[in-house]
Regions:
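Gly/charged, well-structured mid-domain segments that form the phosphate/adenylate-handling core
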Residues: 108-115
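Active-site-proximal beta-alpha loop/turn segments in soluble metabolic enzymes
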Residues: 77-80, 117-119
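Carbohydrate-associated surface elements
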Residues: 4
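Conserved alpha/beta enzyme-core scaffolds, especially Rossmann-like or related mixed alpha/beta domains
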Residues: 55, 72-78, 106-108
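A structural motif corresponding to the C-terminal end of an alpha-helix
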Residues: 98-105
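Active-site core segments that coordinate phosphate-bearing ligands/cofactors
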Residues: 8, 12-31, 36-71, 82-93, ...
Length: 251
């Protein structure tokens, strides 16, 4: 999953698994991406001998519903694995082989948003990525609206046409539907940052009771007085640099 940060761990030579991927292939495959995790598992002998293909949980659900024996991925899910070329709609097999991963694990990639099969006569399309599905389901005017989503992490997403230039990090370009793309800014800590503060306060008070209501009341009081905390919410690092940590100032 996106919260699996094992690929950020440091190996004996002082480099992380993701840094090895970058050095050997030129690709930035961030911790939590499918092939970053697969690379870690492969290097540490954790890939089951009976494993056949790589896919996301949504793709597996489609397989179970339709009875298909091979995963068929929408470009939005394929891109979340890493080593995916959006322009060609294919994975870079050569890059995978450079880090010792078998291209046989690659799933099939769909063109567009086709029906993958049927569940009791009901058509089942390929699964969309969670960011793309959330955008599709919540934004009314895709050409003019932004989607702001705060959960454990946080995301800001904007829909652009296929010819829109690829941005630089920390913005990502992600495949969407009908040939369009999403520009996405993601933080690993959204609501998790508030949960971390609540956990700290609870531990300090040595109580098992949640402290969110008290924190909310203190926040309202601080807004009125102007004595607010300044928080850098990178407590779990960033996708680009997992070693960065957060801070709470003006305590």
């Amino acid at each position: 999953t996106w919260q699996d940060a094992r690929a950020a761990q440091i190996e004996a030579d002082g480099r992380s698994y993701t840094q090895h991927i970058l050095d050997k292939t030129g690709y930035t495959v961030m911790p939590g991406y499918g092939f970053a995790t697969h690379y870690y598992n492969d290097r540490n002998g954790l890939v089951p001998e009976i494993a056949v293909n790589l896919c996301t949980i949504g793709d597996y659900a489609v397989m179970r519903m339709t009875g298909n024996t091979r995963p068929l991925l929408h470009a939005s899910n394929a891109a979340s694995l890493g080593f995916f070329e959006d322009k060609t709609g294919t994975f870079d097999r050569v890059a995978l082989e450079k880090i010792g991963l078998s291209a046989d694990f690659l799933p099939d990639v769909a063109v567009g948003e086709p029906v993958a099969g049927f569940y009791h006569g009901i058509p089942v399309t390929v699964a969309l990525g969670d960011n793309q599905a959330a955008f599709f389901g919540s934004v009314r005017d895709e050409q003019n609206d932004l989607s702001v989503n705060y959960g454990t992490g946080s995301q800001i997403s904007l829909c652009v046409n296929a010819d829109f230039p690829t941005p630089h990090l920390p913005l990502e370009r992600r495949p969407y539907i009908e040939g369009r793309a999403l520009l996405n800014g993601s933080a690993l800590c959204g609501g998790r940052a508030y949960a971390l503060l609540e956990k700290f306060i609870r531990a300090y008070l040595d109580t098992g009771e949640e402290q969110y209501e008290k924190l909310n009341a203190l926040a309202e009081k601080a807004l009125k007085s102007g004595e607010v905390l300044k928080v850098r919410t990178t407590f779990c690092g960033t996708r680009k640099d997992p070693s960065i940590r957060g801070a709470i100032e003006y305590i």
